[in-house]
């Protein structure tokens, strides 16, 4: 069968794109991939049609060649077609390279046993190196244009098989000084360098001279399939979370290169950074992130290599580059950014965020950067939201929210205002227009706009979003909470149709606001019975706020409202309020009301419900009424009512998700042994738990996987069950453990529940050095102190002292790690940080408000953690 015509291919491609799965399932779909590869070599089809065919293969490679065998054959055919192209310039060469790479990757055929892979890799590296590959690949000028495409293909292969191109590092580095496209080569080199550092650190290997070019010929370049195959989980690096998020996904490589590799590594990174200004902003951001992420945990490599770029990047107007700067700041902190740099960066963010011509997305980006600004020395516990310390009155004045702002911008600025109010708890009495005054004025304006009868629903939604944000951020501000409750009560009085919004707000707010708001809304409802539509909203609100309230006023309201309940919807709303009262025990007045409703309601369904509620009230005690009418404790009902009879059987076969039946807490830690151990305590809450299995997951890849723990049984009332959880950090950094419990109930059902995450603090990783012979302590410490340099780093930190003094502080927090003690003047402290680091402290003579601390470590990445730890000792 000959090649299809242009019209036939156009019709076939159109049918395929309309529904790929349906087309491939039909008769024509069986030979689509074969026909496509065959017709690419036909001289009867124009180049434009072939471009369409190759574009289709790029978009739907996984459907055309779904398995490794088909993908291998397709890639081989595409490479053969590439070789057979005439020497004249052609747009097909670039697409053929991309199509062959895509087929191998999407089909899972990329590997050391793949013949197509062994042909493609040398070809791509040769094109990327600018070598003359022969007339089959076009003229020399056209081959230069293929360099960028070859770099893109190599980058895709490296992402799929990290460490594959480690042996080509020297060749790729040599390309930076040659003529050719700078951006593709720079990004490829940065990616390969990043993956090589991480992959080599996984197996404890060094760079082994990989950065030095030995032989640039494509045939002799060693493809490191060993590392690529052993690293079975593809790298999926994420941008560093900022400290306020508390959910960083960091994976610090631990690598200690020899001096020669260190020099070459510094030179390669400096070379990449020096030429980064020639790249597009997005490419620059990617390059900076890759290098920063790779070097973050590399021993002996402080981030000063990035310092020359800060002068240029701090003044950038590109959002992507600004985000990279903030990511570097979050990663390296005061090790890279001075206090002047921090003040300049925050001032710039603040001033730009006030520009009136900013588009809304850009405006929100700058506000988010301010809200999540990674500070060098943050106050308060890690993960707690707070406004930047350097955001003084002059800077914050232009960031106040206004009713004229876009809703999302208003909420972002309101979030910042709430954080400022939280910091200004001790406002001066003479301050007339402080943050709290401004906040109350803004809330009053939002409530007035939402109270307009018939006004836009968006204004009401914005008002409740702002109210929720305020109560979430200012739970400990009674003045603001009281003002907010009063304003919301006035809003309901003016516009009862907003009852659904109030119900949602009551479900979401904290108990500090829920109870006073419930009482105020209850008073507003019973004071204004209303008719028709207003009555419908009052009954909906009353069903939410009636529980726990005195019933006399509510029953009077219901008796007056029953006269106006004329349709089925109002009947149901009235009965929902009665049900809410029944859950709290009911009473004689409620029994009379239910009897009256059972006689008077026009709807038969309503009369039956009223009669049922009366029977329950007459025959059940208050506690049993609450259980019968409260939320069901059983498993959720099945979707089909036909399966109701088998409900219990189905529940017994399924693992049900429930609320946590146990409490897991962190006990006092003991620093001893070769590995840090997290001491936990498990306690049952209300019911016994059997065959308990606790599964732990560490955020990111900071630690080795934590094994599950099995406990035969835990009963309430018994002492807490001790649990020792060994940790194997890959780098000395704090982390969070997500915990899931799988257990059996006394009824024999298997359930699972998510427990609150556990925090592993930096101090929980501290381990002491082995016990030393008496008299050798000082010499041992001096040897450790001298061994830290020049590979390590030295710094000085001011440690505030509380009222307890230096001796008490050392005794409480650092006693197991003291090597030499000369109280009350000097303490020499040595700490082991798993897996292979150490921290040395010299606490000198204490002064009035603190003590100067000289420290050395062989891992500069722990400097910000050490600074935060020492500054926070006085608070504990």
UniProtKB/Swiss-Prot annotation:
Alphabetic keyword roster = Protein transport, Transport
Q: Which Pfam families match?
A: AP5B1_barrel, AP5B1_C, AP5B1_middle, AP5B1_N
| Entries under PANTHER family matching the protein | AP-5 COMPLEX SUBUNIT BETA-1 (PTHR34033:SF1)
What's this chain's function? As part of AP-5, a probable fifth adaptor protein complex, it may be involved in endosomal transport.
Q: Which residues form the signal peptide?
A: none
The name this protein goes by in its record: AP-5 complex subunit beta-1
Q: How does it assemble?
A: Probably part of the adaptor protein complex 5 (AP-5), a tetramer composed of AP5B1, AP5M1, AP5S1 and AP5Z1. Interacts with ZFYVE26 and SPG11.
Cellular component aspect of the GO annotation: AP-type membrane coat adaptor complex
What is the originating organism of this protein? Rattus norvegicus
Q: Name one GO biological process term.
A: protein transport
Calcium is among the record's keywords: no
Tell me the domain of life. Answer: Eukaryota
